């Protein structure tokens, strides 16, 4: 298995798909990386030469991925919570942030239902 940005990349997948194993790289960014590195998107990772792999590593290094991206995201959320703004309060309470209704639905964000005694 090849290692790019500290992640084991699956050998049996096409280069474009295999790059999406890295946190912060989706399909469109993977396509741009392959094009910039002059790597054919449809070639399997195991068939790439070492120079191709090096070019891919250099292109991926230009982006914020993996641990740095996770850290940046958590720091942004923590900043909102410390500010005490509306979005920060919603994060703190575990409720939806973007104006969705909460009287019904919002189960994913709120978690499983909590039983309330005498609610009948």
UniProtKB/Swiss-Prot annotation:
Domain of life the protein comes from: Bacteria
Span list, region Disordered: 94-120
GO BP term (any one): translation
An example Gene Ontology molecular-function term: structural constituent of ribosome
One GO cellular component, as annotated: small ribosomal subunit
A Pfam short name: Ribosomal_S13
Keywords, ordered alphabetically: Ribonucleoprotein, Ribosomal protein, RNA-binding, rRNA-binding, tRNA-binding
Keyword Glycoprotein: no
Xref: Gene3D superfamilies: 1.10.8.50, 30s ribosomal protein s13, domain 2
Record has Lyase as a keyword: no
Subunit structure: Part of the 30S ribosomal subunit. Forms a loose heterodimer with protein S19. Forms two bridges to the 50S subunit in the 70S ribosome.
Stated family: Belongs to the universal ribosomal protein uS13 family.
Role summary: Located at the top of the head of the 30S subunit, it contacts several helices of the 16S rRNA. In the 70S ribosome it contacts the 23S rRNA (bridge B1a) and protein L5 of the 50S subunit (bridge B1b), connecting the 2 subunits; these bridges are implicated in subunit movement. Contacts the tRNAs in the A and P-sites.
Designated name of the protein: Small ribosomal subunit protein uS13
Provenance organism: Aromatoleum aromaticum (strain DSM 19018 / LMG 30748 / EbN1)
């Amino acid at each position: 298995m090849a290692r790019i940005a500290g992640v084991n990349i699956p050998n049996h997948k096409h280069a474009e798909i295999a790059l999406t194993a890295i946190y912060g790289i989706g399909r469109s960014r993977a396509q741009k990386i392959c094009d910039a590195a002059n790597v054919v998107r449809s070639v399997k990772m195991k068939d790439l030469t070492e120079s191709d792999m090096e070019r891919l590593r250099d292109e991926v290094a230009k982006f914020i991925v993996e641990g740095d991206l996770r850290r940046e995201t958590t720091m942004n959320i923590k900043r909102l919570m410390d500010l005490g703004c509306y979005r920060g309060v919603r994060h703190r309470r575990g409720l939806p942030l973007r104006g969705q209704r909460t009287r019904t639905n919002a189960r994913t964000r709120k978690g499983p239902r909590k039983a309330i005694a005498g609610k009948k």
